[in-house]
Amino acid sequence: MAAFGTETWLVRGELFTVVARTFARFAPLELYVRRPAGPCPAEAGDDPERIGCPACWLAADRGDRGIRLRPYGSGVHREPALGPGGGAFVVALLATVVFDGFTQTQRYADLEGFVFQRVGWFGAHETLYGTLLMLGVVALFILAFAAVAGIVGRREGGTAMNGARRYAPTLIPIAGVYFVSHYFLYLVYAGQFTWAAVADPFGREWVPDAEPWTGMPGAVVWWIQVALIVWGHVIAVFEAHRVAQATQRDHRRAVVVQAPLVILMVAYTFSGLWVLGQVLSQA
């Protein structure tokens, strides 16, 4: 922070802030500033009304700023474009959560056993094996997005970089809902033990008989997860169409331009649903 400035570091270097602000574009609330106090510290743009910039919001007078409701996902097209590497970051978020879910399945356990039997070195370096496999999945997701961004960018008369910057935010709904869906099971199950953790914070067995108490069926949890993923996919496709319409006045032309991206979104969504449908590992 001392070297680059507080806001620059938070926007580009502090991981948790970057993740939180990325997912905030999907939120139903937005910060807005009617009359900015000066140039944006985060270099998010110089629009007359600035949306989604905490630095500009804090710097503005109280009468010139506010918080308002908005439709879920509308921040994808209302807020400024993502910074350098923003597209790769969003795709990496999605890929790492999908991979984390895959590592808990029986198929991953079978794959791991198959590899370890044939390459003993990986068996002795299990963490390195998992890291390399995760990087491979992330690279595959990013390469697929880069290829599609190139196609879409050329169809719009621009470059692959332009396509990536414009359409990367449209993947945030898919990444966001899969993130929530992935950890929803932990919330439902482990959340039932919150009272026991509060009553026994040091693990002294003061609450030895803590057990699940909600009785929520696993099928209900699974269907909620599926519904979340499908909902996020629908919002992502809708927002991609709105982004396409910003440069294509003809509705049909906008559909043609975004078609490769929609196919990629279907592939990303299918990968999440496929992982969700796998049998969990007994380990």
Predicted regions and their residues:
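Membrane-entry segments of alpha-helical transmembrane domains in multi-pass membrane proteins
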Residues: 1-12, 27, 76-88, 121-138, ...
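Long, well-ordered mid-to-C-terminal structural blocks that present hydrophobic/aromatic surfaces
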Residues: 95, 99-190
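Membrane-interfacial helical/loop segments at transmembrane boundaries in membrane proteins
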Residues: 106-122, 193-214, 282-283
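Hydrophobic alpha-helical transmembrane segments and adjacent short intramembrane/lumenal linkers
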Residues: 169-244, 249, 256, 263
